[in-house]
Every structure is written in structure tokens, then in C-alpha cells.
């Protein structure tokens, strides 16, 4: 299984089960994880969409090509630097992309728990995503936050449970496992 370490407990990606023979038995199971990144360009009138998100080490783009652009479904209006999730569907035999905005979570940092690698913002505890953001490992880590950050308002981008992009902390730790 390729990339299983990234799905084990650091993703909320759903598992799809397929009965391709129609006999009531599962023939296949697969996981499609979203790809996260930011918008470089978006202009539907020009069939133009490009992003920092990568698939097989290549930026996902329509290349201003109408046929390529038809493979994208946009759930939201986009502007440069929006944080997005791209879900890929290959069940039709073609690579189809669904692009949606990732809404930020804004709240006060009230707890840093280094042992569990979590922070609590707005009353919810979040771990840190271990997949890719903008084609590289996310820079958001529990080590970025310390006691000097408690009470600070943070902006997080999450998959609902794991942070892949966040406001930087001061990294001025004086120890671990702080609460405010």
C-alpha cells in the first residue's frame, strides 16, 4: 500500500468500497485524499486555473485549455491565494477534479500539548496534517507554538481535524503542555 503512513491516523479521508461484479461482495477499497494548496490563477472566461497543489510532483492546472478546464468542477468562486482542497475522481475512467475553498477556523489558542502534538483553538483540539500542502510537507507543527502564543488569535486551515496551514506562532517555548 503506497502512502498508507499518511492515511493511518492523520487524515479524515473517506474509504470507498466497490462491488464491481454486482454480487454483493466487496471487490475493491480505495481512499482518495484531498490535495491542498493555494490558487495561483482563476479565470473561467479564459479556461484558466492553476494552483500550487501538486499531483505526481506537477502543479494542477488547466493550462488555459478548454478541454482540460472541463475536467474541473468549481464549488466556489476563487481568487489568487485562496486555500483550496482538490478532490480527484477517477471512477469514470477520466481524471476529474472538484475544487473547493477551505474555510479558515479563527479562534484563540488556549492549549498547546506537545506530547499529543495538538493545539486547542476556539475550544477544539487539532492535530497536525502529515500529507502535503502546496506540494511539500506542511510547515504547521506543534513545535511552532509555545507559552507566549497562548491567548493569541490564530487562523487555521484544517480538514476538520488536522491542521495543514496556520498562523505562525512565536516558537518561543519555555517548556511543553501549556494551557491558558
Q: Model segments located where?
A:
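...the same signal can extend to comparable exposed beta-sheet modules
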Residues: 1-180
Amino acid at each position: 500500500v503506497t502512502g498508507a503512513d499518511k492515511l493511518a491516523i492523520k487524515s479524515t479521508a473517506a474509504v470507498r468500497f466497490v462491488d464491481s461484479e454486482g454480487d454483493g461482495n466487496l471487490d475493491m477499497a480505495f481512499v482518495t485524499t484531498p490535495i491542498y494548496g493555494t490558487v495561483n490563477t482563476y479565470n473561467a472566461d479564459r479556461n484558466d486555473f492553476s494552483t500550487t497543489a501538486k499531483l505526481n510532483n506537477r502543479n494542477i492546472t488547466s493550462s488555459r485549455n478548454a478541454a482540460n478546464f472541463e475536467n474541473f468542477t468549481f464549488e466556489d468562486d476563487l481568487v489568487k491565494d485562496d486555500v483550496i482542497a482538490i478532490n480527484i475522481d477517477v471512477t469514470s475512467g477520466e481524471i476529474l477534479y472538484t475544487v473547493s475553498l477551505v474555510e479558515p477556523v479563527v479562534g484563540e489558542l488556549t492549549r498547546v500539548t506537545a506530547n499529543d502534538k495538538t493545539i486547542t483553538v476556539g475550544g477544539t483540539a487539532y492535530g497536525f496534517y502529515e500529507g502535503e500542502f502546496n506540494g511539500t510537507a506542511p510547515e504547521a507543527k506543534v513545535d511552532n507554538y509555545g507559552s507566549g502564543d497562548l491567548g493569541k488569535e490564530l487562523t487555521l486551515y484544517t480538514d476538520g481535524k488536522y491542521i495543514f496551514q496556520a498562523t505562525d506562532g512565536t516558537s518561543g517555548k519555555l517548556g511543553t503542555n501549556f494551557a491558558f
